[in-house]
Design a protein with these regions (language model features):
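N-terminal helix-turn-helix
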Residues: 1-81, 256-257
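Amphipathic alpha-helical regulatory segments at dimerization interfaces
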Residues: 22, 38, 49, 90-101, ...
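Amphipathic alpha-helical effector-binding/dimerization core
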Residues: 66-164
Length: 258
């Protein structure tokens, strides 16, 4: 493990990282003045840094709203990281198979710094579908993907991730404590046991009415969940949910290993 020496500082680098971390918390972005205010810096201080980050394609300026947003460059860089690259290569064929079988979109998520990060997505072959955008982040306990990832960890690692989750929720500046308190109480040892027993979670979405999420883990060599594959299932008039669930169970998805 690399020991971090706290007696060194790099103010310009810290400024750039502060901007990137701030922009990661908003889907609509921030104006230059808002960034300066949030980071407690002057507009002049951040002007050059914003230009450099834009030139390097880490951020982009929406000329209509004059707000800065993150680009997908960080996601692209992370996808080139060998473990993530391997995970994507092994998962995508299974995801395509499931999408074809049940006519629904499928997305792949991992745990990242106290939150859930969507790193891959396969569209439904149908002419219409509900899908989750690659690069999206969510509260771990608001999603079936997050709960599955938490369930298939050691107790120590599960608690560590829940602590990091609290920090993520606070950084998001949520106005109510529903996510922080109620959802954590509902995520009981009984729920964990049921997910482990079933090797998946099938549950109505907490975010979208009419959607039932089917989430399954992908294991690493230690039998811990390294990722989760989720099908946001929309009930259709001409399809039977139980039949589609049975079809999914015939694939290699429930025994996937990275």
């Amino acid at each position: 493990m690399i020991k971090v020496k706290k007696n060194y500082s790099a103010p310009a680098l810290e400024k750039g990282l502060d901007i990137i971390e701030l922009l990661s918390k908003s889907s609509i972005g921030f104006s230059q003045a808002e960034i300066a205010k949030e980071l407690n810096r002057s507009v002049n201080e951040i002007y050059r840094m914003l230009n450099i980050l834009a030139l390097r394609n880490y951020i982009e300026l929406d000329e209509d709203t004059e707000r800065y947003k993150l680009t997908f460059k960080l996601l692209q860089l992370s996808s080139q990281h060998q473990p993530v690259k391997n995970l994507m290569q092994k998962s995508l064929p299974m995801m395509r198979e499931v999408a074809q079988l049940c006519n629904h979109s499928v997305h792949l998520s991992i745990y990242y710094a106290g939150k859930l990060l969507v790193i891959g997505q396969v569209d439904s072959p149908s002419s219409f579908n509900y899908s989750v955008k690659t690069g999206s982040t969510f509260d771990l306990l608001e999603t079936s993907s997050g709960r599955v990832l938490l369930a298939f960890q050691t107790e120590e690692e599960r608690q560590r991730r829940l602590i990091r989750r609290k920090l993520f929720i606070k950084l998001q500046k949520k106005k109510n404590n529903l996510s922080l308190n109620i959802l954590e109480k509902k995520f009981s040892s009984k729920i964990v046991h049921e997910i482990i027993k079933n090797k998946c979670e099938v549950v109505k979405s907490l975010q979208i009415d009419g959607v039932t999420n089917i989430s399954v883990p992908i294991f690493d060599h230690t039998s811990q969940a390294i990722a989760a594959v989720t099908i946001p299932f929309l009930q259709r008039i001409n399809r039977n949910f139980q039949n589609d669930l049975s079809l999914i169970k015939t694939t290699n998805l429930l025994k996937a290993q990275a």
